[in-house]
Amino acid sequence: MPPAPGTPPPAARGFGPGRGAPPNPATPADPPATEQLIAGGWGYATISPNSIQADNGAGLTAGIIGLVNKGQRRKPDDWGSLRAWAWGASRGLDYLETDKAVDAKKVGIEGVSRYGKAALVTMAYDQRFALVLVGSSGEGGAKLHRRNFGEAVENLTGSGEYHWMAGNFLKYGTAESSFGSKNAGDIPVDAHQLIALCAPRLTSISYGVPERGDAKWLDQQGSYMAAVAAQPVFRLLGAKDLGVSDDYMKEKMPAVNVSMLDGQLACLQELTLFKAPNVNSYKRFAEGSFAPTAVAWGRDNRTCSMR
């Protein structure tokens, strides 16, 4: 993906509020990941999700969802905020396709946590995106709904998160209703199918580690299982998968910083997810210039993490 001299650069788009947190002045720090991307010949743009759709249930009568519904409450099959944010990312790509300074065929999308969910939805619904980096997405993202571990469907359907999903999804978190009790086992699809919709494009499922704050609540193993279950679709479309068996019940997520970056489908668990020390690993994944995965920390980042 690196641009040839005189050609437009690839671009990464990220969901988030804007600039990242400043480095701690008491410790050595690499330049912010966005600065490293730009220095490496990439472009970078940040999407402000709240400018598209508010991150709360009260906002469902406003934003793009409210605009379509003319300020009325949404219908059961209408979007939640995740799909609305993905729609906004696609409209951003519409613009990038008109900008001759950008190679619009090499635009990726990335996000962490709820924005990791949104990045995965964006990639699944818009075939124009060439790359997705899905960070710590958990339930409603890359994690299998049916795996009874950590965050559950009932959390997504609760008061703090229900607006992320379509209204119809809420019935899968009900103990009592006119149609009876439903749970994750009643959902006709699961996360591996969402990941499969990204094939054969570059798809990275990433997590940090509990010791550094990426809680077990996110269920790293559950997302790895979903990626394993998505492998057949990547192979069907001529892409290289994780290189493990399709037995998602047997396969275990690799150890920290033992990353699976050799194919179009990738999984990795890092000490500092999506932070500056790891950005070169993501660049190598996108560029196809894979490197050994031994951990080596270095202040200038050229030898930092998964080098």
Segments from the language model and where they lie:
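Alpha/beta-hydrolase-fold serine-hydrolase catalytic core, especially in secreted/extracellular enzymes
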Residues: 1-29, 127, 164-174, 182, ...
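Short, solvent-exposed loop/turn and secondary-structure capping segments
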Residues: 49, 55-60, 121-122, 134-135, ...
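Primarily recognizes the serine-hydrolase "nucleophile elbow" in alpha/beta-hydrolase
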Residues: 1, 21, 90-186
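Cap/lid segment of the alpha/beta-hydrolase catalytic domain
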Residues: 1-98, 138-148
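Generic beta-strand/beta-sheet core signal
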Residues: 47, 110-112, 132-137, 206-208, ...
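Alpha-helix capping and helix-loop boundary segments enriched in small/acidic/polar residues
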Residues: 76-84, 109-110, 120, 178-189, ...
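Extracellular/periplasmic catalytic domains that process cell-envelope and extracellular macromolecules
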Residues: 37-40, 102, 113-114, 125, ...
